[in-house]
Amino acid sequence: MNTVKTVRELRAAVARARSEGKRIGFVPTMGNLHAGHAALVKKAGERADFVVVSIFVNPLQFGPSEDLDKYPRTLAADQERLLEAGCHLLFTPGVEEMYPDGMDGQTRIHVPGVSEGLCGASRPGHFEGVATVVSKLLNMVQPDLALFGEKDFQQLAVIRKLVRDLNLPVQIFGEPTVRAADGLALSSRNGYLDEQQRAAAPAIYRTLRQLGERIRAGAEDFPALLADARQALEQAGLRPDYLEIREPISLRPGVPGDRQLVILAAAYLGGTRLIDNLSVHLD
């Protein structure tokens, strides 16, 4: 596995791989990697011949009161994990490499519709930052395919629309959420939880599953279902940010009669905000 820091080095390495007839797979990350990231890299290796991973903690997607400064930087451990997972090329640019003219002057990309509401309401500007950095990375790497985890469901919807609307020549794959044995979705932010908070955290997925079971059983009063689920989260010691039933492509509010739904949740444990989701298929 080679590690490069500049766009010039990145493009040269990818060009060599492509000249050898290799199919390029790409997994963008912010580092502090866990088993969920490793699963994405391994899956990329199944779908492509040459796997590129980026590690870049993107300032554009953090709000002024968010955790940019304390977000863990664990490059040495990340490199070991990526080597084991089958990464061929690691791109670790600095802020100056990604935004050479500064962030204030950076052209930004807004993806309407799917960016609004949910995490978009709680984190103004977040998805603009995501769409901008993903657009830049896809243009830098120019992969045949890119993989993202379904845990960040709204982010995946934003990226799919971005790629579709801008006619970017890349296949986007969403991969299932990797979970701990107790159901908690793996996340870099789980490391912020103390022992008591970590014990309470699986209530998010448990509540989503219970809500999904009620919908599959035929319950159609979505407001009442959501009220019960919010109460369950609060009783478990969480502070809900949002809990919504949506249609999975457009992310419009789900209605009885929809055959495909996704339940999305964000909740706080102390100062740590966790997200999760559950797809519900009624066909």
UniProtKB/Swiss-Prot annotation:
Residues involved in beta-alanine binding: Q61
Key words, A-Z: ATP-binding, Cytoplasm, Ligase, Nucleotide-binding, Pantothenate biosynthesis
Reaction it catalyzes: (R)-pantoate + beta-alanine + ATP = (R)-pantothenate + AMP + diphosphate + H(+)
Keyword Ligase: yes
Keyword Transferase: no
GO biological process, one term: pantothenate biosynthetic process
GO cellular component: cytosol
InterPro entries: Cyt_trans-like, Pantoate_ligase, Pantoate_ligase_C, Rossmann-like_a/b/a_fold
Record Pfam families: Pantoate_ligase (PF02569)
Family named by the database record: Belongs to the pantothenate synthetase family.
Function: Catalyzes the condensation of pantoate with beta-alanine in an ATP-dependent reaction via a pantoyl-adenylate intermediate.
Note: The reaction proceeds by a bi uni uni bi ping pong mechanism.
Subunit comment: Homodimer.
Full protein name: Pantothenate synthetase
Gene behind the chain: panC
